[in-house]
């Protein structure tokens, strides 16, 4: 995304600026004050993107192959994998183009590069928005399955889930086009930040509510079988730990990127903020890491999906 302070604009590569040496150290801002700058090696960035790409392709292939997985829940998981695939793929594509331009292996007009840059940015932004939306959709789906278990199949029908999925993709593409077109307006960046916070609050409220219901259910079973209280307490601790990990990973991987957007609006010239801007590639790397972790949390925990995945891998050999 063409954000102030982000060293990713393709047009900047036409100047043949040498790539920074990978390091973790102090860099100076425009006033000479020291800044902590973490430089991510291009090879590491591309390797993480490739891992995410392969992992999410396998999830999509497994769900597409097994008709038993063609349920609303797995449709949302499949779309999450597809959007994560696009997040990693678009970032890898832009990084590859930047490296080719810097190395002189790709020579083209500045207008063509700018058009390619805008196209990739729309793809990146829309896939990021889709990824966040489908994380929220999965949380809503699980909440309905727990609190409206008897009516779940009448509430969350496959056609209804397909309409929700189509609406998310269309809204994300349209929104990302507007965001990229008007990226220099503060209101646009603030909308993205508010959207992230809304998804974080939605997921936190729904998962905490589900954890509370699960603890009540476990407590009822404990009373029914006259077991000792520690069994229920242990369940609550495990559930709280799982919830903390789930929300913690989401916040740690996505939070720095949206903090960057917020700082672009409120303190673009501040010394501390300018130091944070130097680590933009780190924030993108964290998002790539999230696209690697998502299948582990939402997809690979399913025994049916793992079995299908083995079949897909065996068929490919």
Swiss-Prot record:
InterPro entries tied to this protein: GPCR_Rhodpsn, GPCR_Rhodpsn_7TM, Melcrt_ACTH_rcpt, MSH_rcpt
Subcellular location: Cell membrane
Extracellular compartment spans: 1-37, 94-118, 184-191, 267-279
Family (UniProt): Belongs to the G-protein coupled receptor 1 family.
UniProt-recorded name of the protein: Melanocyte-stimulating hormone receptor
Superkingdom: Eukaryota
Lipidated positions per record (S-palmitoyl cysteine): 315
Keyword Glycosyltransferase: no
Residue intervals passing through the bilayer: 38-63, 73-93, 119-140, 164-183, 192-211, 241-266, 280-300
Protein's organism: Saimiri oerstedii (Central American squirrel monkey)
């Amino acid at each position: 995304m063409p954000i102030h302070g982000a060293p990713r604009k393709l047009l900047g590569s036409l100047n043949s600026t040498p790539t920074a040496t990978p390091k973790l150290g102090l860099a100076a801002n425009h006033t000479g004050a020291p800044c902590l700058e973490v430089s991510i090696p291009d090879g590491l960035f591309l390797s993480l993107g490739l891992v995410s790409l392969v992992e999410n392709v396998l999830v999509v292939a497994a769900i597409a192959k097994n008709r038993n997985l063609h349920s609303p829940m797995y449709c949302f998981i499949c779309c999450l994998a597809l959007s994560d695939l696009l997040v990693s793929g678009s970032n890898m594509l832009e990084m590859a183009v930047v490296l080719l331009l810097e190395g002189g292996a790709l020579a083209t007009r500045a207008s063509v590069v700018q058009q390619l840059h805008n196209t990739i940015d729309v793809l990146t932004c829309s896939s990021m928005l889709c990824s966040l939306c489908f994380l929220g959709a999965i949380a809503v789906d699980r909440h309905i399955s727990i609190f409206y278990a008897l009516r779940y199949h009448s509430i969350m029908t496959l056609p209804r889930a397909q309409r929700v999925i189509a609406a998310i993709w269309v809204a994300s593409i349209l929104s990302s086009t507007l965001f990229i077109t008007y990226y220099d307006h503060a209101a646009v960046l603030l909308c993205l930040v508010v959207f992230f916070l809304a998804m974080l609050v939605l997921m936190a409220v729904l998962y905490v509510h589900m954890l509370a219901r699960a603890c009540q259910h476990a407590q009822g079973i404990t009373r029914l079988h006259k077991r000792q209280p520690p069994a229920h307490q242990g369940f609550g601790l495990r559930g709280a730990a799982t919830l903390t990990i789930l929300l913690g990973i989401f916040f740690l991987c996505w939070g720095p990127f949206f903090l960057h957007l917020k700082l672009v609006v409120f303190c673009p010239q501040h010394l501390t903020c300018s130091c944070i801007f130097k680590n933009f590639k780190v924030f993108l790397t964290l998002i790539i890491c999230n696209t690697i972790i998502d299948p582990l949390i939402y997809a690979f925990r399913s025994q049916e999906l793992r079995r299908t995945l083995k079949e897909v891998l065996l068929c490919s050999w």
